[in-house]
Swiss-Prot record:
Belongs to the aconitase/IPM isomerase family. LeuC type 1 subfamily. The keyword Secreted does not apply. It comes from Pseudarthrobacter chlorophenolicus (strain ATCC 700700 / DSM 12829 / CIP 107037 / JCM 12360 / KCTC 9906 / NCIMB 13794 / A6) (Arthrobacter chlorophenolicus). The lineage of its organism: Bacteria, Bacillati, Actinomycetota, Actinomycetes, Micrococcales. This is 3-isopropylmalate dehydratase large subunit. Pathway: Amino-acid biosynthesis; L-leucine biosynthesis; L-leucine from 3-methyl-2-oxobutanoate: step 2/4.
């Protein structure tokens, strides 16, 4: 029987088969290969184990890092916020008690959990990966079936190394063509979400396919899979290939020698069969894609940067019209305003979507030798301590500092309002993160989701801008099209 990539990985992990479809059907029981843990969604799960007198079933398949609440300045000092400090210390205590490997603040491998897993070679093709975080879909870039789970499910995986799930439907996102200079993976996924909506992928695993996807680097593929959840999907995947293997080989937890050869032989089978059928297929033309930016308060409210803020009257559906009216009011925007006329106060380069080394390189290439708009504050937050060290070895930190940007330590930072890096009410931010909800970056903060190169160009001009808007514009060869 012909199978999709998602179906192959799913079937390989079924411990106990359910009893079919339907609302009352029993789910399948899946084995979980890798469980990623952080400080926010794990305390209750560890406490559940403790109260039940249960051990952690597989400490060797569990890894923790501190990311959501960690400060990105003065990391050698006590954390000022009591709640954040308590959550961090609780994670440390729990990991010590249950034997979980932990990368703490100050550790060379500390960072955002979805950056740390891949960089250590823990995330591998064909795996099932879970974490108490919705952006676990990031790891699907390796051909893994990776899902965010709730705290009760976190406890279940800790206790049993399994998870009960009903099979998902499958959706192919076919992206053919060649991206133009200044158009990146972030623009692909923002365009996908704008096309199918924030609920279009509900109940599906999305598989990203086509020539434009195959041309992308692993960092870029992770950007796309990361935001699958913003389309409502449970997971996003890309079939592994030579690009995947080149990224993985030599990483600390990647197979070696004969084990590597055997692994690659298996990984090469992890592709959708030619005669397999998806439940839904969506097509996107990479040749015509432009830099994308959100104007509203959900990731589906986006347009090409060359366009204007839409009018609520442009939406035929009454619910969409009402949502647009509320979004415009919250964002302080008027319909018809050219997106490139919108001035920002802050530019944030970071998050599990766009904080990897290629993201930093791409942004640095745009700003090198230029001056920052004096009214704009720019924060650059590497996704991990390892990425930070790599960037500093390449001199990227000096490029950002010379430009006038703040060079920070690793963490989730301004992606979400759970640490000191937050927007003030009414402050407008061009952000490389994944969510632009009301208050996401701080109470009353206004967020526009953009790619790293758009973020960099915006920091130069002070208004939402693409690299081609700069004077002089960067040479086409200097703008990466395979990056995130």
């Amino acid at each position: 029987m012909a199978k999709t990539l998602a179906e192959k990985v799913w079937d390989a992990h079924v411990v106990r088969k359910g009893d079919g479809a339907g609302a009352n059907a029993q789910p399948d029981l899946l084995f979980i290969d890798l469980h990623l843990v952080h400080e926010v969604t794990s305390p209750q799960a560890f406490e559940g184990l403790r109260l039940a007198g249960r051990p952690l079933r597989r400490p060797d398949l569990t890894i923790a890092t501190e990311d959501h609440n960690t400060p990105t300045l003065d990391i050698d000092k006590p954390i000022a916020d009591l709640t954040s400090r308590t959550q961090i210390q609780t994670l440390r205590n729990n990991c010590a008690e249950f034997g979980v490997r932990l990368h703490s603040l100050g550790d060379a491998e500390q960072g955002i959990v979805h950056v740390v897993g891949p960089q250590l070679g823990l995330t591998q093709p064909g795996m099932t990966v879970v974490c108490g975080d919705s952006h676990t879909s990031t790891h699907g870039a390796f051909g893994a079936l990776a899902m965010g789970i709730g705290t009760s499910e976190v406890e279940h995986v800790m206790a049993t190394q399994t998870l009960s799930l009903k099979p998902f439907k499958t959706m192919a996102i076919n992206v053919e063509g060649t991206l133009r200079p200044g158009v990146t993976a972030k623009d692909i996924i923002l365009a996908v979400i704008a096309k199918i909506g924030t609920g279009g992928g509900q109940g599906y695993v999305l598989e990203y396919r086509g020539s434009a996807i195959r041309a992308l680097s692993m960092d870029a593929r992770m950007t796309i899979c990361n935001m699958s959840i913003e389309a409502g999907a449970r997971a996003g995947m890309v079939a592994p290939d030579e690009t995947t293997y080149a990224y993985m080989q030599g990483r600390p937890h990647a197979p070696e020698g004969a084990d590597w050869d055997a692994a690659v032989e298996y990984w090469n089978t992890l592709k959708t069969d030619d005669d397999a059928t998806f439940d839904v297929e969506v097509d996107l033309d990479a040749d015509t894609l432009e830099p994308f930016v959100t104007w509203g308060t959900n990731p589906g409210q986006g347009v090409s940067l060359s366009q204007a803020v839409p009018s609520p009257e442009d939406f035929g559906d009454e619910n969409a019209k009402a949502a647009a009216e509320r979004a415009l009011q919250y964002m302080g925007l008027e319909a018809g305003t050219p997106m490139k006329d919108i001035r920002v106060d802050t530019v944030f380069l970071g998050s599990c979507t766009n904080s990897r080394i290629e993201d930093l390189r791409a942004a640095a290439d745009i700003i090198r030798g230029r001056e920052k708009d004096p009214k704009v504050r720019m924060l650059v937050v590497p996704g991990s301590a390892r990425v930070r060290l790599e960037a500093e070895a390449e001199g990227l930190d000096r490029v950002f500092k010379d430009f006038g940007a703040e060079w920070r330590f690793a963490g989730c930072s301004m992606c979400l309002g759970m640490n000191p890096d937050q927007l003030e009410p009414g402050e407008r931010c061009a952000s490389t993160s994944n969510r632009n909800f009301e208050g996401r970056q701080g109470k009353g903060g206004r967020t526009h989701l953009v790619s790293p190169v758009v973020a960099a160009a915006t920091a130069v001009r002070g208004t939402l801008s693409s690299p081609s808007d700069l004077d002089p514009a960067p040479a086409s060869a200097a703008i990466r099209t395979d990056a995130a």
